Amino acid sequence: MTDASSLPLYPHRHLLGISDLSPADIELLLDRADRAVAISRQSEKKTSTLRGRTQINLFYEASTRTQSSFELAGKRLGADVMNMSVASSSVKKGETLIDTAMTLNAMRPDILIIRHQSAGAAALLAQKVGCSVVNAGDGAHEHPTQALLDALTIRRAKGPLSKLIVAICGDILHSRVARSNIMLLNALGAQVRVVAPSTLLPSGIEKMGVIVTRSMAEGLKDADVVMMLRLQRERMEGAFVPSVREYFRYFGLDAEKLKAAKGDALVMHPGPMNRGVEIASEIADGPQSVIQEQVEMGVAVRMAVMEALLDPRRNQEGRKQEGRGA
C-alpha cells in the first residue's frame, strides 16, 4: 500500500480481538485504512503489496459481507485468495477444527481468516498454525474488523471519537459486534450507551463501562451515533421478545425515535438488516444512514489489517533479532 512504510510497525502477529489492542494500535490500523480507502476509490484498485502471499478464508458460518469483503481486500492487495467451503469440506465428515488447521498449515498460507460459531476458535487456531490469523467473528465473543470499520466510518464523518455519544441498540446479548464495539469505543474515549429489553442484555454489562437503559428515548437523547443491531434469532432458544411487532414498537428505529438523537446523528447497522424489525426502511435508506459507507470501509479496514500483519518489516526485525542472538 502506498507509503505504508512511513507508518509505525504494527506490533501484533494476529488480530483475534479488540481486547488485545491498545488505543495506539487501533489508531494505527485506522490510519492505514484511510490510505486503503484512497486505493479503493482509484480506477486501478489493485496493488502488489501482498503479491506472492496466500490468504485462506475459512468460514464455518454463513457470511455475505464479511467473506466477500475479506476476499476483495486480499485481491486488491495482490494476494492469492482461497475460499474454503466448509459445506463441501472434510468438516462435514467430522474433521475437528484442529485437524483442519493442521491440514491448512501444511499448505503454508501466510494468513488465515476464520469465522466460527464457537467463542475462542480463532485463538485456538492461532496456537496451531504458523501464519497470521484474523478473527472474522467467533460466536458471540468478538468481531474485531467490524468494530474497526465502524470506527473508521464514524471518524471520517465526525472526526476523533473522543467524547462522542454512541448508542448501541438491539440484541446486545448475542452480539459479537456489540462487544467489540464497546471495547473499541471505550478505548478511544467515546461515551457508550446500550439500549435493549432486559431479555437481550447480558448480565453484568455495566462492568464493560457502558450506560444501560431500556428506553430508546433515553438512550438516543443527544446521541452522535445510533448503531442498530439485528435480532439474532438463529442464536436464540426460547422467547426473548413477545413478537416482532411488539419489538419494533418499542426498540425499532423509526423517524419519531430518531428525533431524540442529534440532528446530524449517524445511523449505522452491521448488516444483514431486518427491515421493519430493528430499523424502518425510511431510516435505513435515509440521509443520516451511513450503512453503505460501512460496507466500503469494511474492505479498506481488512486491507489495512492484512497489510499490517504481513508487513515485510516484521520479517526484517525477526532476522535482526536472530542475528543478535547468534
UniProtKB/Swiss-Prot annotation:
Output the Gene Ontology terms for molecular function.
amino acid binding; aspartate carbamoyltransferase activity
Quote a single Gene Ontology cellular component term. cytosol
Which parts of the sequence bind L-aspartate? 93, 176, 230
* Alphabetical keyword list: Pyrimidine biosynthesis, Transferase
Judged by the first EC level, this protein's enzyme class is: transferase
Q: Report the EC number(s), separated by commas if there are several.
A: 2.1.3.2
The answer to whether the entry has keyword Amino-acid biosynthesis is: no
The residues that the entry says bind carbamoyl phosphate are: 65-66, 115, 143, 146, 271-272
Family annotation (InterPro entries): Asp/Orn_carbamoyltranf_P-bd, Asp/Orn_carbamoylTrfase, Asp/Orn_carbamoylTrfase_sf, Asp_carbamoyltransf, Asp_carbamoyltransf_Asp/Orn-bd
GO BP of this protein:
'de novo' pyrimidine nucleobase biosynthetic process; 'de novo' UMP biosynthetic process; amino acid metabolic process
| This protein's pathway | Pyrimidine metabolism; UMP biosynthesis via de novo pathway; (S)-dihydroorotate from bicarbonate: step 2/3
Q: Which reaction does it catalyse?
A: carbamoyl phosphate + L-aspartate = N-carbamoyl-L-aspartate + phosphate + H(+)
What Gene3D superfamilies does the annotation carry? Aspartate/ornithine carbamoyltransferase (3.40.50.1370)
What does the record give as the function of this protein? Catalyzes the condensation of carbamoyl phosphate and aspartate to form carbamoyl aspartate and inorganic phosphate, the committed step in the de novo pyrimidine nucleotide biosynthesis pathway.
Assigned protein family: Belongs to the aspartate/ornithine carbamoyltransferase superfamily. ATCase family.
- Subunit structure, per the record? Heterododecamer (2C3:3R2) of six catalytic PyrB chains organized as two trimers (C3), and six regulatory PyrI chains organized as three dimers (R2).
Q: What is this protein called?
A: Aspartate carbamoyltransferase catalytic subunit
Upper lineage is: Bacteria, Pseudomonadati, Pseudomonadota, Alphaproteobacteria, Hyphomicrobiales
This chain is encoded by the gene named: pyrB
